[in-house]
Regions:
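Class I (Rossmann-like) S-adenosyl-L-methionine-dependent methyltransferase catalytic domain
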Residues: 2-61, 68-112, 133-137, 141, ...
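A general, composition-driven signal for non-globular sequence regions
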Residues: 58, 64, 123-126
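A short SAM/SAH-binding and catalytic strip from SAM-dependent methyltransferases
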Residues: 120-134
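A short acidic, Gly/Pro-enriched loop at the edge of an enzyme's catalytic core
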Residues: 109-121
């Protein structure tokens, strides 16, 4: 993969500001986002995670970047034990109210997850908000919360190795080799 040249290495303060700006975007548009994405069909992504899980469920699943809880509710309805995680307080409140599941209020750059707690981690269209310079560290944090033989599913919008703001929302759009 070609190295991104658009955003230079960021300081910890610049990372904090970038992260806060993106979360603030979702805070301001949480209800509109929930409505706009309610009917998105991600069943093939959910099935991809579940068919690769070992053993017999129900599974402990972390929905990383759960937003308003659409996929969290699907996992619960399927009989699993999902926990959500989102950096946006409005999404956390919406997801808790909608699903009655535990939802952690954490952002990707400051994860504090229990070691080996999950059979699976589902990150659907969320980790593209992690700056590429932090991605390896964040992936290591995710790996540490997975049980032995745990499954990590990640889906992100593709791009041409660019990091940019779309309005006030940061995204890293990577080319797949």
């Amino acid at each position: 993969m070609a190295r991104n040249k658009l955003i230079a290495k960021l300081t910890s303060e610049e990372l904090r500001q970038l992260n806060a700006q993106t979360i603030s975007h979702y805070q301001r548009s949480a209800y509109e986002f929930a409505e706009a994405t309610e009917q998105h069909d991600v069943s093939q992504n959910i099935e991809a995670l579940l068919r690769n899980m070992k053993g017999v469920g129900p599974y402990n699943i972390l929905d990383l970047g759960c937003g308003p809880g659409r996929d969290l509710l699907t996992f619960k309805t399927l009989g699993h034990c999902p926990i959500g995680l989102d950096g946006c307080a409005e999404f956390v409140a919406l997801a808790r109210a909608r699903t009655e599941c535990e939802v952690l209020h954490q952002d990707f750059l400051n994860l504090n997850l229990e070691s080996m707690a999950f059979d699976g981690v589902f990150a659907n269209a969320s980790l593209f908000h992690v700056p590429t310079q932090e991605l390896e560290r964040v992936l290591c944090d995710i790996q540490s919360c997975l049980k032995v033989d745990g499954v990590f599913f990640c889906s992100n919008p593709r791009g041409s190795d660019t990091e940019q703001f779309n309005g006030d929302r940061y995204g890293a759009f990577l080319e797949i080799d």
